[in-house]
Swiss-Prot record:
Ubl conjugation in keyword set: no
Top-rank lineage group of the source organism: Bacteria
Protein name: Pyrimidine-specific ribonucleoside hydrolase RihA
Any Gene Ontology biological process: nucleobase-containing small molecule interconversion
Source species of the chain: Shewanella baltica (strain OS185)
One of the record's GO cellular component terms: cytosol
Broad enzyme group: hydrolase
Length: 318
C-alpha cells in the first residue's frame, strides 16, 4: 500500500536523514517538502531542503518555504546543535532547482486538494506551518489521514527541563494541532532518545559504497559532537526525526499507547510542555498515539538497508 506524504521539516541533520530515509521507499509518495524555521533560520532550512533533494536527484518534488517565525513569539534556533549552515559536516551540492513561488501552506493545501487519496503530514520541526494549514483550510481536514510528528515528551524536555525543542519554539501552534481532531502519532523524546546511533552503526553506514551513505555518515559525525556532552548521558546520538518515517515504514518496531496530550502555553516554568495522560487521570479522550518504546537494532537495520537503495541506478534514473 502506498501512502501519500508531505514532509514539513527544518533541516537539520536528523531532518535530512529522515528525508533520505523516506525517499528510499517507493511506498511513500512525497507530494511536497515544506520548510519551517527551527534548527536554523528559515532561509537556511529552505536552502538545506533543496540541497538534500539535489543530492538525491529529486528536483521533481515541489518545495516551498513556510512561516519565518512562530505564531506569536520570536524565533529560537538550535544552531548549537546543527552548526552554522544547519547541515554542517558533509560537502553538499548547491541547489539545482528553485522553490515554488508560493508559501508552504499554499503548497500543502494544493497537494492535499489534488491528491487521489488521503495525505499524511510528517512535520519534524516546529508546528507553525501545520497549524496555519489547519486553521486556514478546515475543508481539507477530512483529506488528512494522520499527522506523524516529531515533538514533545511524556518525560523530561531537552530545551527546558519540561519542554522538547520543537514544541517549545511554537507552543501555540502545537496546541492547535493537538486540538484539531486529526489522528496524531507523537514521536517524542521518550522514544527518540532510544533511537541512538552508535559509532559502530556509523561505520556500517560508511561502508556502504554510495555517495548518499557517505553523506549520512558525515552528517552523523558532526551530529555526534553535540551529543557527546556527558550531561546528556548518551552513548550515541539520538536520531529524533527519522523515527517518524520509521514508524510509517515499520510500526512493529515501536511500542505505542493512545493518550490525551495537552500543550502548556502559559506557564513560566513549563511553557511548551506536552502533558501526556498516560494513566488516564484526566478522563479526557485520547488525541494521540504516543510512542514509548523502540527496537533500536531494528531501527538501525532499517536505516542501513534503506541507504543501500541509493545505488547509481537510483541516482541516475531521472
Amino acid at each position: 500500500m502506498t501512502r501519500h506524504i508531505i514532509l514539513d521539516c527544518d533541516p537539520g541533520h536528523d531532518d535530512a536523514i529522515a528525508l533520505i530515509l523516506a525517499l528510499a521507499h517507493p511506498n511513500l509518495v512525497p507530494l511536497a517538502v515544506t520548510t519551517s524555521a527551527g534548527n536554523q533560520t528559515p532561509d537556511k532550512t529552505l536552502n538545506n531542503a533543496l540541497r538534500i533533494l539535489t543530492l538525491l536527484n529529486r528536483g521533481d518534488i515541489p518545495v516551498a518555504g513556510g512561516a519565518t517565525k512562530p505564531l506569536t513569539r520570536e524565533l529560537i534556533i538550535a544552531d548549537n546543535v546543527h552548526g552554522e549552515t544547519g547541515l554542517d559536516g558533509p560537502a553538499l551540492p548547491e541547489p539545482s532547482f528553485s522553490p515554488q513561488a508560493i508559501t508552504a501552506v499554499e503548497l500543502m493545501a494544493q497537494q492535499i486538494r489534488q491528491s487521489t487519496q488521503p495525505v499524511t503530514l510528517v512535520p519534524t520541526g516546529p508546528l507553525t506551518n501545520i497549524a496555519l494549514l489547519l486553521a486556514s483550510h478546515s475543508e481539507l481536514h477530512p483529506k488528512i489521514e494522520r499527522i506523524v510528528l516529531m515533538g514533545g515528551a511524556a518525560g523530561v524536555g531537552n530545551w527546558t527541563p519540561a519542554a522538547e525543542f520543537n514544541i517549545f519554539v511554537d507552543p501555540e501552534a502545537a496546541d492547535i494541532v493537538f486540538k484539531s481532531g486529526i489522528p496524531i502519532t507523537m514521536c517524542g523524546l521518550d522514544v527518540t532518545h532510544q533511537a541512538q546511533i552508535m559509532d559502530e552503526d556509523i561505520e556500517r553506514i560508511r561502508a556502504i559504497p554510495n555517495p548518499i551513505a557517505q553523506c549520512v555518515a558525515e552528517l552523523l559525525d558532526f551530529f555526534m559532537i553535540y551529543h557527546r556532552d556527558p550531561k546528556w548521558g548518551f552513548i550515541g546520538a539520538p536520531l529524533h526525526d527519522p523515527c517518524t518515517i520509521a514508524w510509517l515504514l515499520k510500526p512493529e518496531l515501536f511500542e505505542a499507547q493512545d493518550c490525551w496530550v495537552g500543550i502548556e502555553t502559559q506557564s513560566e516554568l513549563t511553557l511548551g510542555m506536552t502533558v501526556v495522560d498516560r494513566y488516564q487521570l484526566t478522563g479526557k479522550t485520547a488525541n494521540a498515539t504516543v510512542l514509548f518504546g523502540l527496537d533500536r537494532l531494528g531501527f538501525v537495520d532499517l536505516l542501513v538497508d534503506s541507504l543501500r537503495v541509493y545505488d547509481p541506478t537510483y541516482l541516475n534514473r531521472r
